[in-house]
């Protein structure tokens, strides 16, 4: 089965149990599978107080928006050329076309499929994720990602994957990570829109992945 057909079958069952369902996952299956390194970004929930019923994959395919997705595009650009040191001057200015180009090859999904507001209400998030645990496990397994980046969701995904007792490693600069059940690295990192000086947020992740994966 293709990735898209597996997503469709999973979401068909899942959306019956979750109001205002927002679809997500692999943006372009061909680009994802052709990638030397399959990248998966795990987020909490979409910010849409108006309600769901739309597809994050299409939103990303059209370039998404600068908040959140500029930094993910920067991460992807650096990871696709990890042996090089891309200067900040090459990353500082991001436009819609750049995001479209960089984001086509990724997988991006939210643990909570119903939308929330600007900030996550932890109690609501925890309750929904607990109810949808098996669905989330199945979705993650579809992608067989080489590198997973948890964008403020690392400890949540670790629990969902029943890896609470697995070892958590730390890079020389203090970035934590663990291995999933396929022995692929999962990085516990900040949300891409975190209030951190942007170059530090961008290069902090790249340095960690370079240390672990090269």
Please identify what each model-predicted range represents.
Residues 99-112:
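Short, contiguous, well-structured surface segments enriched in hydrophobic/aromatic residues
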Residues 136-153:
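Proline-aspartate-enriched helix->loop->beta-strand connector
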Residues 79-102, 166-181:
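Short mixed-charge
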Residues 22, 31-34, 85-95, 100, ...:
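Ligand-binding pocket scaffold of soluble enzyme catalytic domains
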Residues 45-49, 112-116, 153-157, 191-195:
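Short, solvent-exposed loop/turn segments at secondary-structure junctions
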Residues 2-12, 122-137, 156-214:
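C-terminal capping/extension of enzyme domains
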Residues 54-63, 78, 112-129:
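Surface-exposed cleft-lining segments at the edges of enzyme active sites
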Residues 1-80, 135, 139, 175-182, ...:
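Active-site and ligand/interface coordination hotspots across diverse enzymes
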